């Protein structure tokens, strides 16, 4: 007698292709995307046992307290370049004191050609990036000020949609405090559905506080009116992003189902908003480091002032050069050298990090100097207020069979 798995019929290749084209996924697949990333990503052994195979411990709440973990958030459009194995990421990831959580988002992790957009997903570059990040974060070193050894970081979530790639890393000692990991993808590319543009959102709970990290790649273009298409992308991402509805085992009721339902929200990515000036005018202001004059013509700032997009969202002060577009392996803006045939693009801050809601305080907002692609990475460090159960007596309950959400661990 054949087992159940062997009797299941795989959907025809045409149906699989249509599902990819239109980013159609069932509820089970949405869970599976996260679970595969966690349990098979090399760091997920602590979550590999099924929820129905073990008992759950709940905390009887008697008092609350607050934590203030630091979160390092970064976005980088790598231009479809597969990272060399010896690529040094120290200047990017080790530019700040150790954070508790690292949220690292990429765009164009693969070239956005027809094969990658319409065909099978190419995850080879993603594996290389994960390996390099793990090696960098966990390299032996000491903090000069305290002499403390490096904390060890685990990859708790990762998700790829064509060229967009989002990863979340946490300190080892925090792994049991991260629960309810879920993912939502929205395609905004060809036909408004394909994944060459769009977003990946990861939802999670840290103790009693919900977090949502949104990594996006919005519509490109520097023609007048293109900013309105980017506004539309943002509105569609907010409208269409939905996380699988499940009950929170901590007893807090239903988990957030939309991006804006979360307590702490950070949006990162290549937003592609440009500077509404000529190439020469923008280049002259950039060379003079006159950021304020450039930012007066920044499309994102203008659209926010007119309340057409990201109303109520915050962004840190920009005090660094534009992040796009640079010539290969150079600090020269693309198109400056008339002897070289290359696309001429007005210098702009395409790569941004924003946040929404209370409980988040940005400690720094900087630009990296890697010349790997035509974009420069942008990163910020946040201090986040997190509610937790300080003390209480544990009560034991049996887990529901088949549930995919994480266990409520016994807190100290």
Name each model-derived stretch.
Residues 1-154, 164, 226-227, 234, ...:
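N-terminal, active-site-proximal structural segment of metallo-dependent hydrolase catalytic domains
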Residues 51, 116-218:
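Structured beta-strand-rich core segments of catalytic domains in phosphoester-bond hydrolases
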Residues 64-71, 97-99, 160-162, 195-197, ...:
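Short, surface-exposed loop/turn motifs at beta-strand boundaries within globular domains
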Residues 71-74, 102, 167, 200, ...:
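Residue-level detector of short, conserved catalytic/binding motifs and their immediate flanks
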Residues 73-74, 103-105, 154-160, 167, ...:
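Extended hydrophobic secondary-structure segments that form protein cores and membrane-embedded regions
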Residues 78, 107-109, 172, 218, ...:
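Active-site metal-binding loops of divalent metal-dependent hydrolases
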Residues 81, 112, 175-177, 210, ...:
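Residue-level signal for secondary-structure boundary sites
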Residues 124, 128, 132, 136, ...:
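Catalytic lobes of large eukaryotic enzymes
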């Amino acid at each position: 007698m054949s087992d159940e798995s062997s009797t299941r019929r795989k959907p025809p290749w045409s149906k699989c292709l249509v599902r990819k084209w239109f980013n159609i996924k069932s509820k089970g697949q949405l869970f599976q995307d996260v679970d595969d990333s966690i349990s098979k990503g090399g760091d997920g052994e602590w979550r590999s046992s099924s929820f129905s195979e073990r008992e759950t411990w709940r905390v009887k709440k008697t008092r609350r307290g607050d934590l203030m973990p630091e979160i390092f958030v970064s976005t980088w459009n790598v231009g479809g370049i597969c990272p060399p194995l010896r690529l040094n990421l120290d200047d990017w990831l080790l530019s700040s004191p150790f954070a508790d959580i690292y949220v690292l988002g990429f765009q164009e992790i693969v070239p956005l050609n027809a094969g990658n957009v319409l065909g099978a997903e190419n995850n080879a570059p993603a594996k290389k990036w994960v390996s390099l990040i793990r090696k960098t974060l966990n390299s032996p070193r000491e903090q000069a000020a305290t002499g403390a050894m490096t904390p060890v970081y685990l990859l708790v979530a990762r998700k790829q949609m064509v060229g967009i790639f989002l990863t979340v890393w946490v300190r080892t000692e925090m792994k049991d405090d991260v629960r309810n990991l879920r993912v939502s993808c929205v395609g905004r590319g060809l036909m408004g559905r394909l994944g060459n543009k769009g977003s990946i959102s990861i939802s999670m709970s840290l103790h009693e506080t919900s977090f949502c990290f949104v990594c996006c790649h919005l519509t490109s273009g520097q023609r007048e009116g293109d900013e309105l298409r980017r506004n539309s992308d943002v509105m569609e991402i907010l409208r269409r992003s939905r996380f699988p509805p499940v009950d929170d085992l901590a007893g807090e009721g239903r988990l957030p189902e939309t991006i804006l339902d979360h307590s702490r929200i950070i949006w990162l990515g290549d937003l592609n908003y440009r500077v509404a000036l000529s190439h020469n005018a923008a280049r002259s202001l950039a060379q003079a480091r006159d950021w304020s004059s450039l930012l007066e013509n920044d499309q994102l700032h203008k659209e926010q002032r007119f309340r057409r997009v990201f109303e109520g969202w915050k962004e840190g002060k920009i005090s660094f050069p534009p992040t796009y577009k640079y010539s290969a392996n150079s600090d020269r803006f693309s198109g400056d050298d008339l002897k070289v045939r290359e696309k001429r693009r007005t210098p702009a801050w395409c790569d941004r990090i924003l946040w929404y809601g209370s409980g988040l305080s940005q400690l720094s907002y900087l630009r990296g100097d890697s010349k790997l692609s035509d974009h420069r990475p942008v990163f910020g460090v946040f201090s986040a207020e997190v509610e937790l159960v300080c003390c209480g007596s544990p009560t034991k309950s049996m887990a529901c069979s088949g549930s995919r959400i994480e266990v409520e661990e016994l807190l100290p």
